[in-house]
Regions:
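Membrane-interface extramembranous regions
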Residues: 1-121
C-alpha cells in the first residue's frame, strides 16, 4: 500500500508540474524526475527508486517552502504566491514522502515502545 501511495503522489505531482511548465520552465526537470520515479516504482520497488522519491519529494517541498517565503536566488528570485493548487500538491507530496520513508523503514522509531514512552511524558 505504501508503494502505491508513493506512485500516486509522484504521478499527481508530475501532472501538476507538467501542466504548469509553460509558465515555469524550471518545473520540467521535476516533472520528468517524478514520471521516471512513478513508472519505475510501478515496475519495481527497488531501494534506489524509493530513495529517489524521498529526495525528489522532500526537495520539492523544501524548494516550495523557500520559494513561497524568500524566493530562490538565480532560479526563482521572486516570492511564489501561495495558492490552493500549490498547497494541495505539497500535501500530496508530503503523503508520498511519508509513504516512501515508511517503505525505507525510516519511520520505525515512531512506533517503538521507547519512543512512545518518551513522547508520553
Amino acid at each position: 500500500m505504501s508503494r502505491d501511495v508513493v506512485i500516486l503522489a509522484c504521478a499527481v505531482s508530475a501532472g501538476v508540474h507538467a501542466a504548469l511548465a509553460p509558465q515555469h520552465a524550471t518545473f520540467v526537470p521535476a516533472a520528468l524526475a517524478l514520471i521516471v520515479l512513478a513508472v519505475g516504482l510501478a515496475r519495481s520497488p527497488a531501494p534506489v527508486l524509493v530513495e529517489g522519491a524521498i529526495v525528489v519529494l522532500g526537495g520539492l517541498i523544501a524548494a516550495y517552502a523557500l520559494a513561497a517565503t524568500t524566493g530562490i536566488p538565480l532560479v526563482h528570485p521572486d516570492r511564489e504566491p501561495v495558492t490552493g493548487l500549490a498547497l494541495a500538491t505539497k500535501a500530496i507530496e508530503a503523503l508520498g514522502l511519508l509513504a516512501a520513508l515508511e517503505l525505507k523503514g525510516a519511520t520505525r522509531w515512531l512506533t517503538s515502545t521507547a519512543t512512545a514512552r518518551s513522547l508520553s511524558r
